[in-house]
A protein has these predicted regions:
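A structural signal for well-ordered alpha-helices, especially hydrophobic packing surfaces
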Residues: 10-13, 17, 35-42, 56-63, ...
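Amphipathic alpha-helical binding modules
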Residues: 74-110
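Amphipathic alpha-helical hairpins
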Residues: 55, 64-68, 72-82
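Short, charged, amphipathic alpha-helical segments
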Residues: 25-29, 49-54, 74, 78, ...
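Short, charged early-sequence alpha-helical segments and their helix-coil boundaries
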Residues: 40-59, 69-72, 98
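Amphipathic alpha-helical coiled-coil segments with heptad-repeat character
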Residues: 3-6, 17, 24, 42, ...
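Short terminal alpha-helical segments
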Residues: 1-35
Length: 110
């Protein structure tokens, strides 16, 4: 289930017309790293993983929609960043990846 949801995010990013190819490549690389980190903790932190993936889906949706709503976009990024806070000590790479994704999407001005 989680891998399918992450694959849908990947497809959404690949199909986006609003993201430059170089930025898209970096986001897809970060998503690949996120998949690895999520897989590593999915058995021990299943509820956290559900939240992370859920907010990642929302963030991807808001970032790639044609009629953008800045308020919903900001809320989705805040939710995504908040979803990993409890894992900062035990899984710093996961937190780094999520924070990098949030910053990159935010900086793109999507």
């Amino acid at each position: 289930m989680i891998p399918d949801r992450l694959n849908k995010i990947e497809e959404k990013l690949k199909q986006s017309q609003s993201i430059k190819e170089s930025d898209k490549a970096e986001l897809l690389d970060l998503l690949s790293k996120l998949k690895t980190e999520i897989t590593d903790i999915s058995d021990t932190h299943s509820e956290d993983v559900e939240s992370i993936v859920g907010f990642a889906e929302l963030s991807a949706h808001e970032a790639t929609r044609s009629d953008k709503n800045p308020e919903l976009f900001d809320l989705s990024l805040k939710g995504l960043a908040s979803s990993v806070q409890s894992l900062e000590m035990s899984h710093p790479m996961l937190v780094f990846i999520i924070n990098r994704i949030c910053k990159m999407i935010s900086d793109l001005g999507i």
